[in-house]
């Protein structure tokens, strides 16, 4: 009887360890320094320790500034790297039961713009096109060719660079892109475009890639 109990406890422990090894925090700790130039390995470990101890997870980064991990879940991490930049990570299951890591790096100066990347759990970069078809200008700005207002058309021409802020969700497997091009434009031109702006573009993770969920003209 004792042998069976011991074997059961060993198997349960191994199962729990296996689950923990698949959590975002484990992959985050093992992230190569080359992909985390602002944070040291000690910084990354301290983030986890602080949050798990119910403490504010703020560290002094490699360049002497303050960085704070603001969210930690089994499959999600968010860090405020600097006052103007943030980093997010999401652990996503693929159709063949393996997992990939999605990261979003956002910088605001002052308009926010994000870069989305995908990696294996060993932090080898994967082609983004295999997992996401990114949104384009027309997904956010619906400016009909029939618009005759010169000021509106002029404002549309000033929106010549697509800037978007991407956000991974801690609660589900969605990825949301918000149009930020108007944040770098002059206020008057941005106001002219407001009636033609669509809602944020939302993608949902399905069968190993992000699929467009909804866009709206509202």
Where are the predicted features?
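Acidic/hydrophobic-patterned starts of short beta strands in beta-sheet-rich repeat architectures
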Residues: 96-106, 172-178
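Bacterial Sec-dependent N-terminal signal peptides
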Residues: 1-27
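Short aromatic loop motif centered on NTY/YTY
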Residues: 129-205, 214-218
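Short consensus segments that form the blades of beta-propeller domains
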Residues: 79-80, 106-112, 189-194
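Terminal domain-start segments
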Residues: 22-93
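Surface-exposed loop/turn elements that mediate protein-protein interactions on large endomembrane-trafficking
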Residues: 66-78, 120-129, 207-209
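Mid-length scaffold segments of soluble, non-membrane domains
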Residues: 100-135
């Amino acid at each position: 009887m004792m042998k069976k109990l011991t074997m059961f406890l060993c198997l349960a422990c191994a199962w729990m360890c296996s689950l923990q090894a698949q959590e975002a925090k484990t992959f985050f700790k093992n992230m190569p320094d080359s992909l985390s130039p602002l944070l040291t390995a000690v910084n990354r470990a301290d983030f986890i320790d602080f949050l798990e101890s119910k403490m504010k997870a703020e560290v002094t980064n490699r360049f002497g500034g303050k960085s704070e991990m603001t969210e930690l879940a089994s499959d999600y991490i968010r860090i405020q790297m600097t006052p103007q930049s943030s980093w997010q990570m999401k652990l996503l299951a693929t159709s063949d039961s393996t997992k990939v890591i999605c990261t979003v790096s956002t910088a605001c100066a002052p308009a926010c713009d994000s870069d989305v990347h995908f990696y294996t759990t060993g932090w080898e970069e994967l082609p983004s096109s295999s997992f996401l078809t990114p949104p384009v200008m027309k997904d956010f700005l619906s400016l009909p060719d029939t618009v005759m207002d010169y000021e509106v058309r002029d404002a549309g021409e000033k929106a010549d660079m697509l800037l978007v802020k991407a956000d991974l969700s801690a609660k589900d497997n969605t990825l949301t892109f918000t149009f930020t091009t108007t944040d770098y434009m002059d206020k008057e031109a941005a106001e002219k475009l407001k009636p033609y702006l669509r809602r944020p573009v939302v993608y949902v993770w399905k069968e190993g890639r992000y699929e467009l969920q909804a866009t709206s003209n509202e």
